[in-house]
Amino acid sequence: MSIRVGIVGISGFGGGEAMRLVAGHPSFELVYAAGEGSAGQRLAERFPGVPAKLADLVIEKWDPARLPSLDVLFASLPTGASRDALARVPDDVKIVDIGGDHRYADGWTYGLADVWPQEIASKTRIANPGCFPAAALTPLAPLLADKLISPDTIVIDAKTGISGAGRGGGTGFGYAESNENLIPYGLLRHVHMPEIERSIARISGGSATGLVFTPHLVPMTRGILATIYARGRATTAQCLDAARRFYEGSAFVRVTDKPPQTKWAAGSNLAFVSYAADPERNLVIALGVVDNLGKGAAGQAVQNANLMCGLPETAGLEGAPVWP
């Protein structure tokens, strides 16, 4: 029997990617789509390449009081837009919030699926991690768990594609402004900082108050590369070994000897991690790559929904990355 799925915020990049993944999922059936900017349109008008079986599904105006019978709801709304509305969704509907309103909120489980999968299976309210936390915490988790680095010395330098700014865009995100340009933003106050700090402290049992995180927009469509520096006396071999043990049996995290590239993960739910360390300099470098719309958003959301529904976590996510 199919699992009835709805997507709120389908007009945006995250919601659109969720639609693409749900459309190809062996157990999910998309029966409801809502989007403020596209209400009244057929799905094929908004996404001309949508599968024929979904072409005539009409996008509705988001109203939690008028939901059809659903098993799972994906919410991909701007920060501040989902907290009150999702509270009115019936308790028996499983929700994965791709937006930022419920990360570490009471009553919600933080869905970093490759680190804490056992906590997700029995829950009905999952807060998907942000794209930068997904890219940074995945390589950091093994080092923190094995006490190979000091959690209060972490510096994260991250680069993301323009789709990370969302479909709404705005000044600074147009082609003429972003092409051949590198744009730092959110210095010292990025919205993902508290989420990263709290997760580092949770994994390590120590303080992350010294965290430095600087994101940059780069002129590519999708992908995140996080280059992370921390103090520690570990060797490169010890870091790689810790990651291989931590992610043994993982369907999505790949530990690689050479530095990963954003193209490796494009269009997929994969995460690539690698390390370089110099114990004489008390320095560890960790590298993490994800697709910001995949593992950083809709891919991880589907992975979380699979776990919530008792399905194989790889269901609907087994496609290879797009190359080149």
From Swiss-Prot:
<keyword id="KW-0028">Amino-acid biosynthesis</keyword>
<dbReference type="GO" id="GO:0005737">
    <property type="term" value="C:cytoplasm"/>
</dbReference>
<keyword id="KW-0963">Cytoplasm</keyword>
<dbReference type="InterPro" id="IPR000706">
    <property type="entry name" value="AGPR_type-1"/>
</dbReference>
<protein>
    <recommendedName>
        <fullName>N-acetyl-gamma-glutamyl-phosphate reductase</fullName>
        <ecNumber>1.2.1.38</ecNumber>
    </recommendedName>
</protein>
<dbReference type="Pfam" id="PF22698">
    <property type="entry name" value="Semialdhyde_dhC_1"/>
</dbReference>
<dbReference type="InterPro" id="IPR036291">
    <property type="entry name" value="NAD(P)-bd_dom_sf"/>
</dbReference>
<dbReference type="InterPro" id="IPR000534">
    <property type="entry name" value="Semialdehyde_DH_NAD-bd"/>
</dbReference>
<dbReference type="GO" id="GO:0051287">
    <property type="term" value="F:NAD binding"/>
</dbReference>
<dbReference type="GO" id="GO:0006526">
    <property type="term" value="P:L-arginine biosynthetic process"/>
</dbReference>
<keyword id="KW-0055">Arginine biosynthesis</keyword>
<dbReference type="GO" id="GO:0003942">
    <property type="term" value="F:N-acetyl-gamma-glutamyl-phosphate reductase activity"/>
</dbReference>
<dbReference type="InterPro" id="IPR050085">
    <property type="entry name" value="NAGSA_dehydrogenase"/>
</dbReference>
<keyword id="KW-0560">Oxidoreductase</keyword>
<keyword id="KW-0521">NADP</keyword>
<comment type="similarity">
    <text>Belongs to the NAGSA dehydrogenase family. Type 1 subfamily.</text>
</comment>
<dbReference type="Pfam" id="PF01118">
    <property type="entry name" value="Semialdhyde_dh"/>
</dbReference>
<dbReference type="GO" id="GO:0070401">
    <property type="term" value="F:NADP+ binding"/>
</dbReference>
<comment type="pathway">
    <text>Amino-acid biosynthesis; L-arginine biosynthesis; N(2)-acetyl-L-ornithine from L-glutamate: step 3/4.</text>
</comment>
<feature type="active site">
    <location>
        <position position="131"/>
    </location>
</feature>
<comment type="function">
    <text>Catalyzes the NADPH-dependent reduction of N-acetyl-5-glutamyl phosphate to yield N-acetyl-L-glutamate 5-semialdehyde.</text>
</comment>
